[in-house]
Amino acid sequence: MQQHLSKTAYVYSDKLLQYRFHDQHPFNQMRLKLTTELLLNANLLSPEQIVQPRIATDDELMLIHKYDYVEAIKHASHGIISEDEAMKYGLNDEENGQFKHMHRHSATIVGGALTLADLIMSGKALNGCHLGGGLHHAQPGRASGFCIYNDIAITAQYLAKEYNQRVLIIDTDAHHGDGTQWSFYADNHVTTYSIHETGKFLFPGSGHYTERGEDIGYGHTVNVPLEPYTEDSSFLECFKLTVEPVVKSFKPDIILSVNGVDIHYRDPLTHLNCTLHSLYEIPYFVKYLADTYTNGKIIMFGGGGYNIWRVVPRAWSHVFLSLIDQPIQSGYLPLEWINKWKHYSSELLPKRWEDRLNDYTYVPRTKEISEKNKKLALHIASWYESTRQ
């Protein structure tokens, strides 16, 4: 299969669904299967584009993670970790609880990203899509925010070390990409850009615009924190004002894009007020940046997104569609997909690609929120330009 790849490689295997903490946990990889089947049923994804993830080696994991942490994850995989050790490594709560074979399943997510990196760097694919990845909260020595191994950071370091690539990470998840940021805070070969809901009210509490890197990494960390209840127009305006100057100045060889879709107003864990309009526009703009500045080299990841029935499948489908230069979809979803999954869904499935917006609430403070966001975005853009002079 991998000898006859089209320009876009799409990572999928049912093995990726095994990254699962417990049945009631908000992080549910069934969203990946729902998205993949939607794309297949709509004849937008072909089986020839699908590649299998490999399992990342310990040495690859330790490009970012500490040896003792990787060993602790292995112990937790078999239920032989002490309570003190679990607490030390962030594995003792509902957020990042232990599950069987967690090391292997987590390393498979990382391996999926590295598979794409090798395909792109060998010229067998131009770009890649790994919606099962995007675990941006994992720290070098601690699990965090539903994330065990940080596949994004590992892939960035792998590309930098193995292929001498300058890597730009663009993260549009509602939560700040803290694990990725801190992994490269003093690095000038990897630049991290994150636009997110302000940490004043949302996990992980970081991502202030004054977090800008240190030592040779100063100016290689860019954060754009937005106010709660930010709507589409403000999110997209601030994103475009701040991200292209970073790409243009840093001159990356490749972009890693984190496409959390929890900025949607229906997401149960966040407070932003965006719709599918933003979630459809964002990946297409990032694809434009890759086409313009990196000769099209880009890997698009998944990320957050906890309304797995009404939001994630349609939004993530467009992450892939942006890579294959297909237009934004409209009209009815495939009946085959609806008829299969309506028996499993906890809520009424959408019938169309578009949001109905029948339950959308317009916030009275929209103007004030947008003005505050724009003022900050302009300040960040001005600061960034000054660091490049």
From Swiss-Prot:
UniProt pathway annotation: Ketone degradation; acetoin degradation
Gene Ontology molecular function: histone deacetylase activity
Entry keyword set: Acetoin catabolism
Pfam families: Hist_deacetyl
Gene Ontology biological process terms, A to Z: acetoin catabolic process; epigenetic regulation of gene expression
Gene3D superfamilies linked: Histone deacetylase domain
Keyword Methyltransferase: no
Its job: Role in growth on acetoin or butanediol. Involved in the breakdown of these compounds used as a carbon source.
Family: Belongs to the histone deacetylase family.
Name used for this protein in its record: Acetoin utilization protein AcuC
Species in which this protein is naturally found: Staphylococcus aureus (strain MRSA252)
